[in-house]
């Protein structure tokens, strides 16, 4: 995959003609506000009401820390140091990017926001993370970003990921946004940070009918044609599943070639769908898919595997 920075002349020329934006960058404040509202709405009378409420509180903590302690400009992302070639190679690749220690400052702030609301179980997790050394927390983060989930407490992973995601989301705001993909390679991971998607979202409005995959880490969305499997690019054996009806706003797209699946959210059927919240709230669809022998290809920041299970 390559990402090319457009000169101003091309940007202006393209503005007057329809095109499918290759990348959609999140507005951090709006993203968290929408997520909080959606979690609140979906939690009403839901079998997992308590956990959805907890997830909403984590998003509230992320929003509060974003507003109170925004990170400074990273000098590595200055225009002088970040070339078009750099942008073409997953510029914020989660396993290559050397994290600034500020991510741990964000983590401590998120834990402080959560502490007054925490029940005994959550409080124990928070206090354990607080007692760890910086090196221990960095080690957990390394394993988490490498998807070595079997070595990590799923309860701790939620908070570590929340801080990492808040850090990466702000880094994305610091790179040029006037860029686009020139090839369709490796679209099963985020072209910015190389992380897995949460779900795909079928847009309405200006991007009517276009499919975008939503990154679980940096929250960027990237365009991928709907005729391909999001995991293996094959086209011949795609099926769609839902729990209630054919016009459901949340479906699972499965692939008979790689035997994986990823949720698809349809804004036309419910304009309020939100990648992380709706994916988590539709967990019973995941159960159905796993019973069919299919493996989830996406990653939800509130659904890490439990190594003790």
Swiss-Prot record:
Compartments (UniProt record): Cytoplasm
Molecular function as annotated in GO: ferric iron binding
UniProt KW keywords: Cytoplasm
Residue pairs linked by disulfide bridges in the UniProt entry: none
Gene3D superfamilies according to UniProt: FdhE-like domain (3.90.1670.10)
The UniProt record lists the keyword Cytoplasm: yes
Family matches, as InterPro entries: FdhE-like_sf, FdhE_C, FdhE_central, FdhE_N, Formate_DH_accessory
GO terms of biological process kind: protein maturation
Keyword Repeat: no
Domain of life where this protein originates: Bacteria
GO cellular component, as recorded: cytosol
PANTHER family reported in the protein's UniProt record: PROTEIN FDHE (PTHR37689:SF1)
NCBIfam families listed in its UniProt record: FdhE, PRK03564.1
Job of this protein: Necessary for formate dehydrogenase activity.
Similarity-based family: Belongs to the FdhE family.
Name of the molecule in the record: Protein FdhE homolog
Organism of provenance: Pasteurella multocida (strain Pm70)
């Amino acid at each position: 995959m390559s990402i090319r920075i457009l000169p101003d002349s091309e940007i202006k020329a393209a503005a007057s003609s329809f095109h499918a934006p290759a990348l959609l960058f999140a507005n951090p404040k709006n993203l968290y506000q929408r997520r909080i509202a959606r979690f609140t709405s979906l939690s009403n009378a839901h079998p997992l009401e308590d956990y959805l409420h907890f997830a909403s509180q984590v998003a509230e903590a992320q929003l509060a820390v974003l507003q109170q302690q925004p990170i400074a400009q990273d000098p590595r992302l200055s225009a002088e140091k970040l070339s078009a070639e750099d942008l073409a190679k997953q510029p914020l690749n989660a396993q290559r990017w050397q994290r600034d220690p500020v991510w741990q400052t964000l983590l401590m702030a998120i834990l402080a926001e959560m502490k007054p609301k925490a029940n005994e179980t959550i409080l124990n997790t928070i206090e354990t993370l607080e007692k760890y050394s910086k090196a221990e927390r960095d080690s957990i983060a390394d394993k988490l970003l490498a998807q070595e989930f079997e070595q990590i407490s799923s309860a701790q992973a939620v908070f570590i990921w929340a801080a990492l995601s808040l850090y990466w989301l702000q880094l994305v705001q610091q790179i040029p946004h006037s860029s686009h993909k020139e090839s369709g390679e490796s679209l099963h991971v985020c072209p910015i940070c190389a992380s897995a998607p949460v779900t795909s979202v079928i847009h309405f409005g200006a991007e009517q009918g276009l499919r975008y995959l939503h990154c679980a880490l940096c929250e960027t969305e990237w365009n991928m044609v709907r005729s391909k499997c999001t995991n293996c690019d094959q086209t011949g054996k795609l099926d769609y599943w839902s729990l209630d009806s054919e016009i459901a706003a949340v479906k699972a797209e499965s692939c008979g070639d790689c035997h994986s699946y990823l949720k698809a959210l349809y804004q036309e059927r419910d304009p309020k769908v939100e990648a992380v919240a709706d994916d988590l709230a539709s967990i019973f669809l995941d159960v159905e898919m796993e019973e069919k022998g299919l493996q989830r290809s996406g990653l939800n920041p509130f659904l890490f595997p439990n190594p003790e299970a």
